[in-house]
């Protein structure tokens, strides 16, 4: 019994000593723990909790520079109150939600000081592809998967239907490699 108690205390202390998700401030969160580095900017969600869709900006990169990781759009999920939510299709979002351009314009005006203080400053994030590109003359190409290798990461907008988020709620954004489900990354987001 005493051994079990000591083991439990060690687990609790180790978990407290090595937090997985860092709160970077200004609605930004990052996690360097898993094989996929993941940073999430949730500033737009926190500014507009009543929107029918939640916009998160995801920054992903591989921890091992020699590994090529491909994340399929179906392998990006939001877990809220124990329920897993998938992203809508691009067609569904464009049909049901006219606020995409407003979201992106609003996001451009948010401060990036929080997210840039994380590991993302060490990687390059090409803007040629996106899961949810805004329609326009010089828009990125819509893709169903994003790849990362070496010092090149993948940045994309991710939308989820709003399940009724409120201030103080916690949710988790999870991603995994298309070919190897053991290669994952996740970030816990606290809605403030």
Task: Please describe what each predicted stretch is.
Residues 20-192:
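Conserved functional micro-motifs across diverse proteins
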Residues 3-15:
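Sec-dependent N-terminal signal peptides
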């Amino acid at each position: 019994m005493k051994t079990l108690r000591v083991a439990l205390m060690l687990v609790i202390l180790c978990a407290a000593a090595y937090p997985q998700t860092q709160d970077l401030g200004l609605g930004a969160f990052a996690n360097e723990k898993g094989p996929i580095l993941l940073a999430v900017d949730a500033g737009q969600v926190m500014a507009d909790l009543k929107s029918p869709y939640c916009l998160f900006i995801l920054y992903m990169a591989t921890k091992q520079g020699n590994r090529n990781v491909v994340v399929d759009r179906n392998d990006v999920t939001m877990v809220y109150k124990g329920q897993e939510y998938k992203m809508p299709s691009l067609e569904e979002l464009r049909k049901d939600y006219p606020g995409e351009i407003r979201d992106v314009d609003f996001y451009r005006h948010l401060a990036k000081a929080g997210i840039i203080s994380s590991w993302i400053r060490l990687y390059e994030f090409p803007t040629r592809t996106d899961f949810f590109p805004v329609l326009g003359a010089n828009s990125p190409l819509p893709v169903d998967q994003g790849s990362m290798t070496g010092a090149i990461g993948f940045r994309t907008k991710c939308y989820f239907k709003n399940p009724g988020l409120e201030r103080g709620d916690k949710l988790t954004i999870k991603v995994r490699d298309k070919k190897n489900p053991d290669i994952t990354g996740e970030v816990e987001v606290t809605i403030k």
